[in-house]
Amino acid sequence: MRKFASGATRDSDEGKNDYDGFLSYPVLEAFGDYMTVHRKQADGKLRDSDNWQKGMTQAVYMKSMFRHFFDVWALHRGYKRVDKKTGKEITKKEALMALLFNVQGYAHEELRKGKK
């Protein structure tokens, strides 16, 4: 039990998840920026921000995860990567955020299995 100078009390935070310590603000902000840019679909329509939570197969996430990991790996090794659709150079930040999206999506589907 914690007691504060004001007289307020609160349970101990022992054993509770410390999201403030576990998560990185700059990474989450970069991820949000990445997701905002990629909300626009090929047909020009804007998809809902939680569209991915409707469900995709883990195989889809895995294939994409491999492609984006390959980009991260190549960039890490000093190679240049170019998006074959747009011709734009892929940055390490973009490749990492794409990888993070797919890891999160794969994990989301894995955790949903236990709730069905």
Where are the regions that the model predicts?
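Intrinsically disordered, low-complexity regulatory regions
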Residues: 1-116
